[in-house]
């Protein structure tokens, strides 16, 4: 283990201390929502871009499944996230 500038390096892995937890359900839903909004605005301009439309549908499905998981595990966090992202409840 080498220490370099406040980071721990294990071979190929660099581990840094960060405030957000990128593996959390909330962060993943937030990330998917940003991608969904970006793709939706792209599809308004390019209506015949069917590969992007397919990607949008995949992202919608992933977000729906993550939200269903969060609603089942912790309803309070689910309601808070829905309110923050301004998306409909399922």
UniProtKB/Swiss-Prot annotation:
Subcellular location: Plastid, Chloroplast
A Pfam family reported for this protein in Swiss-Prot or TrEMBL: Ribosomal_S15
Keyword Chloroplast: yes
GO terms of biological process kind: translation
Main subcellular location: plastid
InterPro entries tied to this protein: Ribosomal_uS15 (IPR000589), Ribosomal_uS15_bac-type (IPR005290), uS15_NS1_RNA-bd_sf (IPR009068)
Gene3D superfamilies reported in the protein's UniProt record: S15/NS1, RNA-binding
SUPFAM superfamilies registered for this protein in UniProt: S15/NS1 RNA-binding domain (SSF47060)
HAMAP family, per database record: Ribosomal_uS15_B
Alphabetical list of PANTHER family matching this protein: RIBOSOMAL PROTEIN S15, BACTERIAL AND ORGANELLAR, SMALL RIBOSOMAL SUBUNIT PROTEIN US15M
Protein name stated in the entry: Small ribosomal subunit protein uS15c
């Amino acid at each position: 283990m080498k220490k370099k500038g406040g980071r721990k390096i294990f071979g190929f892995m660099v581990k840094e201390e960060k405030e957000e937890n990128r593996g959390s359900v909330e962060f993943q839903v937030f990330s998917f929502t940003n991608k969904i909004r970006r793709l939706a605005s792209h599809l308004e301009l390019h209506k015949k871009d069917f590969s992007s439309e397919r990607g949008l549908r995949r992202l919608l499905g992933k977000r729906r499944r993550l939200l269903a998981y969060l609603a089942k595990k912790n309803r309070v966090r689910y309601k808070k996230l829905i309110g923050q992202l301004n998306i409909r409840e399922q």
